[in-house]
């Protein structure tokens, strides 16, 4: 409970002059050595009717002098108990400390308010159960470097604690203490600073890490080069442009950066270096972009740096496109408003040679490729499976399919490819009924293209049709064979004519 005097003192905001010195003293509003004190609002104190101080500063001074009554008064005026403890520590007023410390209970709450390292240490000692490690940890939090300067030697040999404090200082970004620990104590894992710098994206911390590393090794040290390379890879992977530039100050290869920048589509990094590197490197980057399935903007940036000229490495490019099944660059070159570069057929040929049916169909849909073109390529490359599947999909009607396959044979020069298509036609006719006209047309077609075995098979089938018309057809085929020196076709036609003559009544 407050006394009547305390209630008066707590709530008195009136001027003190009319009260006289005696009343002021009786009210406890006189601060010995300083003069009268008056409350000004909730946060300030007027001393001797002249000086205005923050209440927490006033209670700190009063506590340092050991003036318990004035301390009590200022606490009534919403002064801070924590600053009272600080003042008592400054004046070594242990009676006051003993009286008020229990109301706080934990000295660590006060530490951030203390600027003087000696008082800081005294405050920490109030908790008798605390260790040196606790003192150092709070010194890091509160940037109290003098604590390390005073007791740092006690850490020598304690590798675990040194590492713990070093990493804590890095996480809290306390650069002064990081420097002191790094240069004065043996930190067995200095590189921990870089991991923390990457996570916090703190370039100052990152630069400080190199300063500490270079205190131990030179830039030509193999270990240092390995560290730089790892940093460049990670920084460029994450798109940390400033970190990349910082690492390159100490060494490393720009190529390392560029390949990661392409892979992860960091165009800011790429644009900074792209015009400073040789064409051969750009070509490798484009191939890497295909492998990494880079974005449209990344491809355009790379291609524009070589003016979209891909001829010198077009074979490698096509190989990469087909191998990694990524066709964006083909599309970009085709979409150019001027000087289009059409690699659709070239890529298609490699796809037909090496890829699966599904991959080829996807490409056909993407670039609106005519099925005939694919079937003819498949025939040249002896891809029987593709001929069958693609022609079946393109022309469901069997007679329609035969018609298109015949057209392809007529326009092909590749002998083996033509034969393969004709055998495909023959396989279709094996389970398709042909009328007289269709059967005769197909027989003549085989004769024109010197398909001896197929011609013989069709001749056998044609005997079921009108013999007179068939004989006329055979004479046409014989004429064709003689004109082109198709000896086996001529022999077969001649034999069939003789047989018809033999069995036909005269």
UniProtKB/Swiss-Prot annotation:
Function: Plays a role in virus cell tropism, and may be required for efficient virus replication in macrophages.
Pfam families with a match to the protein in the record: DUF249 (PF03158)
Induction of expression: Expressed in the early phase of the viral replicative cycle.
Keyword field: ANK repeat, Early protein, Repeat
Domain of life: Viruses
SUPFAM superfamilies: Ankyrin repeat
Family the entry assigns: Belongs to the asfivirus MGF 505 family.
Name of the molecule in the record: Protein MGF 505-9R
First and last residues of every ANK repeat: 54-83, 253-283, 313-343
Coiled-coil region: none
